[in-house]
């Protein structure tokens, strides 16, 4: 075994697929994080006081997109489904590139792009993890997912760096075209991974899995029914809702503070880029050197339960010392924890499930539930501000939510570790 095998806990024959999965996430996140700082400045351009409307618009867009996703999923073989979705989104990136080239600084194009990129991000990432949960079996996922997730963090490092270096030469339209180009290698990687799956992965001879040559059956709303009929999936839904609530509280406070302290758009872009770079660098280090060891020694329970507890402590620190520096540290801890620990742990929860739940139900949770939680949390934060609760009291509310999030994370982790019964999964 090579040092790299040992570093990522790969066994014989697993290094190549782990690297292919790593590269797939690297391409996706490099493209997205080139565009994320652009999205943040566009959100502020419309007014921080209007962010809740953008969150609501994103949720409404999800209400349309999720049934369309389900309709296509029932008609396209699982083996090539990712190709169809990614080519669809690549065409939209090119369309927005043309719009930004023709109309360089329109307010409504900026708002539309903010909403669209929020939809794009969740769909392409959710589908990539659905693919990986389909390719690797339960034990392979537990060993390899933390290292594979490092591809996302490396992409999060390279994306802003490339965006910063190329923005002056290519402009926003050129960056969108480059992001569309980065989707193309993922199609080749998907094909190779599905071939490996049939011989050495979750679909190897003797494994009880559904063949990927057929579409995932069900009507366009089947994913919603699967979620509502499963205590296990409803638990994951509640976990995601609590995650989005803490995230949105911090996000709104960050946007408000950045708008106050850095009124210039160029300064705002630099602040967001610096925060993104810091988050991704720390996430990459944790994914490569910490998360895998935590998963091996303490299991999914630790991946899901510890970070929310740290976020609760961060909210308490904000209540005592409501400074931008403290907020930035809490924001970094939350995002690093999500990328390095919670995301791999959350994806492991889906590995034992069937194809319908990996693709249909998972997509509903990762998109509709996630953005619904964003919208609900945005209006809750707006309500708390409107009734005159100070920043300290809002932070205390956030701490309480984070504690509930931690308790549910421990519960889901223990559920997964002991094995899920058919009754808990649902009919």
What feature does the model see in each segment?
Residues 87-106, 309-323:
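C-terminal ends and interior cores of transmembrane alpha-helices
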């Amino acid at each position: 075994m090579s040092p790299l095998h040992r570093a990522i806990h790969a066994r014989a024959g697993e290094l190549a697929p782990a690297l292919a999965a790593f590269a797939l996430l690297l391409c996706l996140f490099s493209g997205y994080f080139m565009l994320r700082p652009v999205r943040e400045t566009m959100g502020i351009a419309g007014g921080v006081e209007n962010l809740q409307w953008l969150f609501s618009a994103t949720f409404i867009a999800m209400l349309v997109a999720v049934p369309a996703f389900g309709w296509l999923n029932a008609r396209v073989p699982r083996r090539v489904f990712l190709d169809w979705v990614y080519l669809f989104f690549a065409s939209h990136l090119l369309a927005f590139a043309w719009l930004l080239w023709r109309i360089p600084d329109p307010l409504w194009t900026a708002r539309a792009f903010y909403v669209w990129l929020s939809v794009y991000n969740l769909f392409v990432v959710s589908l990539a993890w659905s693919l990986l949960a389909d390719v690797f079996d339960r034990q392979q996922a537990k060993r390899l997912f933390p290292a594979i997730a490092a591809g996302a963090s490396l992409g999060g490092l390279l994306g802003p760096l490339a965006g910063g270096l190329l923005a002056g030469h290519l402009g926003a339209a050129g960056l969108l075209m480059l992001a569309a180009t980065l989707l193309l290698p993922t199609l080749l990687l998907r094909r190779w991974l599905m071939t490996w799956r049939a011989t050495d992965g979750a679909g190897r001879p003797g494994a009880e899995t559904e063949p990927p040559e057929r579409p995932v059956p069900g009507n366009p709303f089947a994913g919603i029914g699967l979620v509502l009929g499963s205590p296990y999936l409803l638990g994951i839904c509640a976990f995601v809702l609590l995650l989005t609530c803490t995230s949105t509280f911090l996000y709104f406070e960050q946007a408000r503070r950045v708008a106050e302290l850095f009124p210039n758009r160029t300064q705002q872009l630099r602040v967001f880029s610096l925060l993104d770079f810091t988050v991704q660098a720390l996430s990459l280090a944790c994914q490569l050197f910490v998360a895998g060891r935590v998963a091996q020694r303490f299991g999914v329970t630790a991946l899901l339960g510890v970070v929310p507890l740290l976020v609760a402590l961060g909210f308490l620190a904000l209540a005592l010392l409501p400074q931008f520096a403290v907020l930035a540290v809490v924001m970094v801890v939350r995002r690093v924890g999500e990328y390095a620990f919670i995301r791999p742990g959350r994806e492991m929860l889906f590995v034992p499930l069937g194809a319908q739940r990996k693709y249909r139900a998972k997509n509903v949770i990762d998109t509709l539930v996630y953005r619904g939680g964003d919208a609900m949390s945005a209006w809750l934060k707006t309500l708390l501000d409107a009734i005159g609760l100070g920043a300290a009291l809002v932070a205390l509310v956030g701490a309480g939510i984070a504690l509930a999030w931690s308790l549910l994370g421990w519960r889901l982790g223990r559920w997964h570790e002991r094995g899920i019964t058919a009754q808990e999964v649902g009919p």
